[in-house]
Amino acid sequence: SLFSSALLDNNKFVAMTGMMRSAYRGHDWAKALESAEHVLHDTRSDSKIKAEADYIKAKSYLATSRRAEAFKVLAELSKDVSGPYGAEAAYMVIQDSYDRGAFEEVETKVYAFADAGSDQVYWLAKSFIVLGDSFAEREEFEQAKATFESVRDGYEPSGPDDDVIDDVTMRLKKMESIISQQEQN
């Protein structure tokens, strides 16, 4: 393998991180987990590489139905939302709270994410959409609508594949329909 044939320590480290990424992208979850552990325990790993390794570990756990282990890693990773891995982890933890019906928890976590001052606006916007959904689930339709409008008015899409505005537009139409029906009754 590339790792065993590398002679210099730095080349071994590059090979190890490459093997982790390759296993993850190739959906070889067991190898991705094993490689991520090696990267996490290597003294040459900086905080960015460790965050990536934790992310790969969590996503690999999810892919192999090891949900509890995944969310333990995601909860830890979500403590630093300054980078893309921590921000996505925060969103996933928020979505999990929503899925469990823990709507007050959703609210607390979204506001904590916002207060952290992260520049990861995509994941923050997705988190606010989940917050709006949690208001709708509690039949707080005006609050849900205001949350979705806030995302719509304050979010700048990052490119043509960005789904935030489409998600918000669909939800706003639904809220307007529900509110209109309530006013008629």
Residue ranges of model-derived segments:
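Acidic, polar-rich low-complexity tracts and alpha-helical solenoid repeat scaffolds
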Residues: S1-N185
